[in-house]
Amino acid sequence: MVAKTLYGLEDVLATELTALEAEEVTVGRRMVSFRGDKRMLYLANLRLRTALRILKPVITFHAKTTDEIYERLRLFDWTTVISSDQTFSIDSVVYSDSFKNSQYISYRTKDALVDFFRDREGKRPSVRLSNPDILLNIHVSHEEVTLSLDSSGESLHKRGYRVAETTAPLNEVLAAGILLKAGWDGNTDLIDPMCGSGTFLIEAALIACNIAPGIYRRGFAFQRWADFDPDLYDELFHDDSAERVFDHIIYGSDILPQAVAAARSNVERAGLGRYISLSVLPMQQRPKPESKAMLVMNPPYGERIKVEDMQQLYTMIGERLKHNYAGCSAWILAFKPEHFNHIGLRQSHREKLMNGALECELRGYELFEGRRDSFAERKSRRAEGEQGVGRRIDRRDVSAGREKRSNSMDRENKPPYRSPRPDKPFRTSDNRKKEHNDEQQRETRWPNDRFRSSDESERGPRKSSSKRIQVIRNDE
């Protein structure tokens, strides 16, 4: 089977499938393949938080043209997946240089199905784009074609608890994936200071209480399959043995009253009001949390929700995180790199995620008092400081001894300096001044004396020297 997901959530989905005890879990591009029975198929639809669809492959073959696809599907026994009285729709996904038009592949698949039933029974199933009985999926990778049954029907991100929404609501699968990547397990409080219609809040409560996200849905496509087992499904649907108690609080706030009203309606529909506290409050006015908490937020990008000054918004976020949430962790989904630059904090986690058609980034921050230093660095500096105290004491002892030695030498009674050369007399301050004046007079009379031989000194300066200097000046 195949579980489809959003770009960047494949690793989280694989972890979820492993926890469900699925076999042969393999990560692919926006999908994770696995093996399992009918029970696993039902569980995957009910309990996976980061899956969009669960597909059950029925036939795989190779083809180079759309005509080959038609011929192979024309020979397939369609009665194993659909009857002539049912409705259907076809979704196609293509990753191939040989096939450019995914919609045309859907048309050719429909032709093969209709021609099969018309030749066999004289009647054909009807196409219904909205809520069909059977949803088919054609996946083309290079020249490999796979026909699958879509067991989910509507995308699994449509949980069923959303009865109200705001502009640009966050995808439920994406929200759950971000929380799982952040390591949310319900062991602390959680805060969303820009909660919108409450997607993060509800998904966080479902994870904390380990409530299956699929219990709010009206149904799944596999319930209309010929081999549907209602007893098995009812057993799994009503099994709440894995649910747990959540002892913390999830706080949600927003500056817009209508957003908080929408969030409250959705929270009530999900039956999670006892875990979630809502308020109309800008982020600047949120009080400091009483204990360690996790912050998660999806601020406006400036695309669909217009904000007058994006730089000011994200700068404010960074300032509030730094000064109000020390000891907490924060996870932010944003669209443009400059948004994070305005936050001005060093991230501990960074990766790309898709929010609809927008390529966004998720960044995580560990918030510390003052500078962002790791505990190991702080411990190292503390140890060095303790050792430095001992070193400073030693230096003070040495300095104190040096000061005593300096004071013990009376400069006024110090004997005159005696040159190590035997032909030099004792030097007093008057002698040193006289020697210095004589040296200056010699330098004035013969500036080049020190560079001349003894013969030249007797004759005086060379006459050609001034000419040589003049030539040099002319050349310059």
What positions do the PLM features span?
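Short, charged/polar, Gly/Pro-enriched secondary-structure boundary elements
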Residues: 39-46, 154-157, 371
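Conserved S-adenosyl-L-methionine
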Residues: 170-288, 303, 311-313
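SAM-dependent Rossmann-like transferase core, predominantly class I methyltransferases
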Residues: 147-181
